[in-house]
């Protein structure tokens, strides 16, 4: 069993409290009350600790703008089924990020969300997605991707790397 090596609480604007802990197997877990339904992580965690796996608790519904950008040591992100939105540049520049689960229920992936995550080579897009904004997966290692949608959704300009092969279901409707 993993041992907690660091932990803390952050009081957010409006008085909500969010807790976090880091275990000796390099896992950061964030949980607790969230302001505006969006996790906002203070610079204290970023500057003090190194971890490879980020786990967000089931209470998280959105990840805010630039929350985890340029966290070079993150290799894996586990998102809860409650997540609905990953906002602009949430994981921008996480160059060692290799694995992200996008659970059923997620609806929006903001612009530049995973841009610059050059180690990210595969991603499974759930059919609950309604919007993927510009450059969401640009400058990643994704070479091919299958989209599950039979109905058109919003996909922004250059949301995948330039040479990405996109597979579309045969029964998909034209926009």
Predicted regions and their residues:
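Structural signature of tandem-repeat unit edges
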Residues: 23-35, 49-62, 72-85, 95-108, ...
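Right-handed beta-helix
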Residues: 40-48
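Consensus positions within tandem repeat domains that build extended binding/scaffold surfaces
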Residues: 44, 64-67, 87-92, 110-115, ...
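Viral virion structural and adsorption modules
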Residues: 2-5, 35, 39, 175
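A composition-driven surface/loop motif
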Residues: 15, 37-40, 64-66
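Short loop/helix-cap segments at secondary-structure boundaries that form the rim of catalytic
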Residues: 158-161, 175
């Amino acid at each position: 069993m993993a041992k907690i090596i660091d932990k803390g609480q952050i009081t957010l604007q409006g008085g909500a409290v969010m807790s976090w802990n880091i275990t000796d197997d390099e896992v950061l877990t964030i949980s607790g009350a969230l302001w505006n339904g969006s996790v906002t992580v203070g610079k204290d965690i970023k500057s003090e600790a190194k971890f490879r796996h980020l786990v967000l608790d089931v209470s998280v519904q959105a990840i805010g703008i630039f929350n985890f950008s340029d966290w070079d040591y993150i290799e894996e992100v586990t998102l809860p089924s409650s997540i609905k939105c990953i906002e602009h540049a949430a994981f921008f520049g996480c160059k060692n990020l290799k694995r992200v689960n996008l659970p059923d229920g997620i609806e929006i992936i903001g612009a530049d969300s995973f841009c610059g995550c050059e180690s990210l080579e595969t991603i499974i897009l759930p059919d609950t997605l309604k919007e993927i904004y510009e450059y969401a997966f640009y400058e990643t290692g994704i070479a091919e991707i299958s989209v599950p949608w039979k109905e058109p959704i919003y996909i922004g300009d250059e949301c995948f790397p330039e040479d990405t092969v996109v597979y579309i279901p045969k029964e998909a409707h034209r926009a």
